[in-house]
Amino acid sequence: MATIVQDIAIESGADDVWDAVRDVGAVHERLVPGYVLDVRMDGDTRYLTVPGGAVVRELIVSVDDDLRRLAYSAVEGFRIPLTHHHASFQVFPEGDGHCRLIWTTDVLPHEMIDQVRPRVVRGAQVMKETLEQRAGR
């Protein structure tokens, strides 16, 4: 399994960042506006509409407020031929008004890592910009 880890330093408090991350039905508004266009929830299943109109179906695996950790798995609607996708976000406080957001993504087949990595890197950039802008930074 190939793994991508994004360690994102964010100029915003951990509680505020976690509140946005855990709001799984509003990622298109609170985390990655423009990168995800719309979200529809059906229980623990999230449907993301992305630019171009594709719909990605994800299972929300865990939302752990104590650990500030969200785990999810994309299971359908890939633009690239993946057989497995699992990812997690975890927020760590780093002093007043700062935190780290660790985004870990595992994919199969291994060979797809070079196609997945730029999407994750861009998503991390959009998240950082969005969260810091909302924090007034």
What are the language-model segments listed below?
Residues 1-3, 53, 67, 84, ...:
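A general secondary-structure signal for short beta-strands and their flanking turns/coil
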Residues 1-40:
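Hydrophobic ligand-binding cavity/cleft-lining segments
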Residues 26-80, 102, 133-137:
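Glycine-rich portal/gate segments that line the openings of hydrophobic small-molecule binding cavities
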